């Protein structure tokens, strides 16, 4: 039985179903999964695997001192040779003595475990831990999911330069992400494209309940600037000026709620826009059943499970050309892909859907449904991850 250590900042939240699904899938196929996180989980966050939490090295002096003392004991008694190897590897990379010693202490809660694979769930989590897997004599894997590849390095020069020099097997969500890694000097044979997957038994097209003449538009997104929601609201204002009767519903939570509410107010569309907050997957499905059009007009997007769910439910989808979205939706075949940051174009595209012939709408929906069922199901993704760890 292979033991896989998955490293994340925190226990996966309600919207990060891909990690939970992956853990269950690997366990069902004979893998043992250990989860390592740096922030303690909330009481309601229950996972089907053993979770190891980093001791608190920040905060009060007493708790910090206790954590340092425990880490020193582990260093001496649990993993002395691994600790020595990690220190030497970090020093050979030119890291300062203080940084090397800090790494020794902060990574002890992982280092003391025997693993076949050490898989960092985001590129950002691997920074500063580039030598940990080698010191543990484990294979190293890193997933890039979008923001960590495109946003995190923007204000950090050479952020991944050390990581890209190491022997790493990479997992990315799209062909574009693979091409971008290759452009940064990563060997293409080290990169595996495994797209997101959805529960196709839950998100399955049925009979729509929409009978209103009002166009029902839906978005499922974290309320974050990268989701392009302000541009989407501007497009809704254009639709209103053109006399299109619509209702726009946004599912999700985030720090941008107040800003978006004010934007809707200033644009004069508060009556047409609803922010309904966090919803369960079953509730999301009900919102999709009651909708006509799905919009994901992100500025940056790794791939987006919600777009897959919307296609599986038979919604007409309009998305931006941000990274993986252009592979998620096939332009003119399963939906429409348009340039980002162009609200007028978004409004025109949505309005155009009103006048599409019925046979064309049906064709788009059927093609999208069949493609998602065939290519983006959980069973296929699980098989691909089994092959990934067999590489």
Label the model's feature ranges.
Residues 176, 197:
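Carbohydrate-associated surface elements
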Residues 278-279, 286-291:
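Short alpha-helical donor nucleotide-sugar binding micro-motif in glycosyltransferases
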Residues 261-279:
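Nucleotide-activated donor-binding/catalytic signature segment of Leloir-type glycosyltransferases, i.e.
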Residues 331-332, 336-343, 352-358:
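Conserved acidic donor-binding segment of nucleotide-sugar-dependent glycosyltransferases
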């Amino acid at each position: 039985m292979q033991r896989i250590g998955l490293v994340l900042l925190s226990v996966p939240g309600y919207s990060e179903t891909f990690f939970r699904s992956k853990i269950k899938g690997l366990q069902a196929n004979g893998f043992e999964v250990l989860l390592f996180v740096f922030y303690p989980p909330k009481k309601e966050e229950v996972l089907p695997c053993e979770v190891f939490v980093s001791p608190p090295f920040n905060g009060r002096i007493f708790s910090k001192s206790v954590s340092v003392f425990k880490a020193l004991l582990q260093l001496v008694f649990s993993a002395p040779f691994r600790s020595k190897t990690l220190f030497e590897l970090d020093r050979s990379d030119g890291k300062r003595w203080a940084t090397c010693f800090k790494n020794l202490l902060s990574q002890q809660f992982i280092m003391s475990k025997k693993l076949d694979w050490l898989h960092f769930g985001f590129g950002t989590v691997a920074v500063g831990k580039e030598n940990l897997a080698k010191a543990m004599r484990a294979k190293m894997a890193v997933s890039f999911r979008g923001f960590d590849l495109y946003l995190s390095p923007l204000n950090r020069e050479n952020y991944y330069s050390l990581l890209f020099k190491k022997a790493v097997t990479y997992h990315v969500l799209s062909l574009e992400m693979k091409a971008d890694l290759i452009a940064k000097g990563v060997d293409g044979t080290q990169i595996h494209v495994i797209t997101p997957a959805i529960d196709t038994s839950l998100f399955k097209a049925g009979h729509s309940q929409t009978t209103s003449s009002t166009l029902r538009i839906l978005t499922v997104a974290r309320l974050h600037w990268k989701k392009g929601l302000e541009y989407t609201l501007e497009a809704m204002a254009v639709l209103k000026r053109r006399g299109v009767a619509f209702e726009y519903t946004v599912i999700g939570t985030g720090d941008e709620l107040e800003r978006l509410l004010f934007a809707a107010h200033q644009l004069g569309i508060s009556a047409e826009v609803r922010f309904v907050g966090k919803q369960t997957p079953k509730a999301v499905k009900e919102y999709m059943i009651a909708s006509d059009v799905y919009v994901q007009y992100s500025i940056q997007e790794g791939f987006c499970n919600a777009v897959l769910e919307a296609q599986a439910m038979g919604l007409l989808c309009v998305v931006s050309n941000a990274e993986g979205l252009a592979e998620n939706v096939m332009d003119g075949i399963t939906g429409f892909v348009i340039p980002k940051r162009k609200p007028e174009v978004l409004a025109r595209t949505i309005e155009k859907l009103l006048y599409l012939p019925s046979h064309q709408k049906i064709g788009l929906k059927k093609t999208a449904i069949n493609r998602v069922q065939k290519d983006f199901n959980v069973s296929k993704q699980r098989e691909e991850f089994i092959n990934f760890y067999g590489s």
